[in-house]
């Protein structure tokens, strides 16, 4: 319960936040909504690598913490960041500059392709930033610090991503690019939170 409940609650609220994001995007019209739907398919695929890193990181860190090898656990987090950043930069470049080729896989409607590409342009930095954030989350999960993982995840979503996405959606010149930018901004906030937590924990030791 101590480990599973916070993660389950975070996942539930995260899924609800995606419903809210869809509502914000719907304000821009049917074409924008369709483009967002197409872009989300690509986003889900792009997030597979950092998600895999996070899961493997949690397992590796927990093994080393259990063996009393904290230094190796820390080293694995930074190694994961490095691997993720290299892959993330490649994915970023492709999504940022050739994202229309990816959206064209799912539709032949030119307007939907461009709207999907617009969202991907704002979202693109997320492919790099999550390499850092997800490695940190994996590190904390490996230490059974799941309550903190839940708190920082909810803070990102409720304090930054949703308010910023909503604000961008009600602007006179609202665009999917600006709404998409809410994700990497929230991730930067998450990196700062987790960085502070990491420093605080190490000072206590």
Report each predicted region and the residues it spans.
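Hydrophobic faces of transmembrane alpha-helices in multi-pass small-molecule transporters and flippases
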Residues: 1-20, 24, 45-49, 53, ...
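Short alpha-helical transmembrane segments in multi-pass integral membrane proteins
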Residues: 1-5, 61-126, 169-205
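Transmembrane alpha-helix boundary and packing residues in multipass membrane permease domains
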Residues: 7, 11, 19, 23, ...
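Helix-terminus/linker motif at the lipid-water interface of multi-pass membrane proteins
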Residues: 12-41, 45, 63-64, 103-110, ...
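Alpha-helical membrane-inserting segments
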Residues: 13, 17, 21, 25, ...
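Membrane-helix interface segments
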Residues: 31-32, 146-147, 175-176
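Small-residue-rich hydrophobic transmembrane alpha-helices
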Residues: 35-99, 130-152
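Short runs within selected transmembrane alpha-helices of multi-pass transporters and secretion channels
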Residues: 51-54, 123-142, 148-160, 164, ...
